[in-house]
């Protein structure tokens, strides 16, 4: 077993870092700070961070085949031109729910942008229940709604054979799976593949590795866990020196490094003293497994 190393690599004290995604072309890590309404791109070669400020909470960012990026801002699917910092609205959802916003999002293997919504929180993980829905933005900019009654739409990814969609609604305290039709984007046959243990707390962001195992960031649990979705067993736990771990992705030259985002919002003064790196970006090396490259939105 290789020796696992957890290091803080970017000290910016984000309020709620989320949605890390690796951009191979620029050797950069993209991520968002939801309540600060900023999308960040950290160049790991130059160690420079660029930011684009937007006009509403921004909950996820993804690569786009045409260049630039896509992001979920408020309740809008948007395209983002990084060079001139312009944002173009592609579609809107939940127009009847003024208190809603998007949360986590990710692009599927066919280039659709999946993202779900939730009610705006009154405190971290405190909100009006069952207000969210799961959507996807197709390459033609049409939107499909899959289901509603969601609490906090969160981590999502697809199996390596593209036949299973994995999904987290945080307050269910489970990781779920659906049968997935890559051609149509349809999902069906929802079932639970993992139930969180008490000390693992709230399941948040998620990514898959090159062996088909899932990695879940545990909000308030201060860890990422590796799961086998076929057996429902936890295979590994990697603890971090912060409680509010929010999401994870693989990156680096060969996708052998894991990047983890976290939050500081919700910590009191004592918590911030105890966790000076809350809100920073972490890198985990030595996991002995690689990730896969992220997919890009095809529209």
Curated annotation (Swiss-Prot):
Tissue expression notes: Mainly present in the liver. Weak expression was found in the brain, lung and kidney.
EC number: 3.1.1.17
Pfam assignment, any one: SGL
Record-listed substrate binding positions: 101, 103, 121
A cellular component annotation (GO) from this entry: nucleus
InterPro entries for the chain: 6-blade_b-propeller_TolB-like (IPR011042), Regucalcin (IPR008367), SGL (IPR013658), SMP-30 (IPR005511)
Active site: 204
SUPFAM superfamilies, A to Z: Calcium-dependent phosphotriesterase
MF GO annotations: calcium ion binding; enzyme regulator activity; gluconolactonase activity; zinc ion binding
Keyword Ribosomal protein found: no
Modified residues (N6-succinyllysine): 144, 244, 253
Subcellular location as annotated: Cytoplasm
Cofactor(s) needed by this chain: Zn(2+); Mn(2+); Ca(2+); Mg(2+)
Record carries keyword Metal-binding: yes
Knockout consequences: Mice do not thrive after weaning when kept on a vitamin C-less diet. They develop scurvy, have reduced bone mineral density and brittle bones. Hepatocytes exhibit accumulation of lipid droplets. Mice display increased mortality after about 3 months, and their life span is shorter than normal.
Keywords: Ascorbate biosynthesis, Calcium, Cytoplasm, Hydrolase, Metal-binding
Triggers of expression: By calcium.
GO aspect biological process, one term: positive regulation of ATP-dependent activity
Residues annotated as binding a divalent metal cation: 18, 154, 204
Complex and partners: Monomer.
Family statement drawn from the similarity comment of this UniProt entry: Belongs to the SMP-30/CGR1 family.
Purpose of the protein: Gluconolactonase with low activity towards other sugar lactones, including gulonolactone and galactonolactone. Catalyzes a key step in ascorbic acid (vitamin C) biosynthesis. Can also hydrolyze diisopropyl phosphorofluoridate and phenylacetate (in vitro). Calcium-binding protein. Modulates Ca(2+) signaling, and Ca(2+)-dependent cellular processes and enzyme activities.
Name of the protein in question: Regucalcin
Gene name in the database record: Rgn
């Amino acid at each position: 077993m290789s020796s696992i190393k957890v290091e803080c690599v970017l000290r910016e004290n984000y309020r709620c870092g989320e949605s890390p995604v690796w951009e191979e072309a620029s050797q950069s890590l993209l991520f968002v700070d939801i309540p600060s309404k900023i999308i960040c791109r950290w160049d790991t070669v130059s160690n420079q961070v660029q930011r684009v400020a937007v006009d509403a909470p921004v909950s996820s960012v993804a690569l786009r085949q045409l260049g630039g990026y896509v992001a979920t801002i408020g309740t809008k699917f948007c395209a983002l031109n990084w060079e001139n910092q312009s944002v173009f609205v592609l579609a809107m959802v939940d127009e009847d729910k003024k208190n809603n916003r998007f949360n986590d999002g990710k692009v599927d293997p066919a280039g659709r942008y999946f993202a779900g919504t939730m009610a705006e929180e009154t405190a971290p993980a405190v909100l009006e229940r069952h207000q969210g829905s799961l959507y996807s933005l197709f390459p033609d900019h049409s939107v499909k709604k899959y289901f509603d009654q969601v609490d906090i739409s969160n981590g999502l990814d697809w199996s390596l054979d593209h036949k299973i969609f994995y999904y987290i609604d945080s307050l269910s305290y489970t990781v779920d799976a659906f049968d997935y039709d890559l051609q149509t984007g349809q999902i069906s046959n929802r079932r639970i593949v993992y139930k969180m243990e008490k000390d693992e707390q709230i399941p948040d962001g998620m990514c898959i590795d090159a062996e088909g195992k899932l990695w879940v960031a545990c909000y308030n649990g201060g860890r990422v866990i590796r799961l086998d979705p076929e057996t429902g067993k936890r295979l590994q736990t990697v603890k971090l020196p912060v409680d509010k771990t929010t999401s994870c992705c693989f990156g680096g030259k060969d996708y052998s490094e894991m990047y983890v985002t976290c939050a500081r919002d919700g910590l009191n003064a004592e918590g911030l003293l105890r966790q000076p790196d809350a809100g920073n970006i972490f890198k985990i090396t030595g996991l002995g497994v690689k990730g896969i490259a992220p997919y890009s939105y095809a529209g």
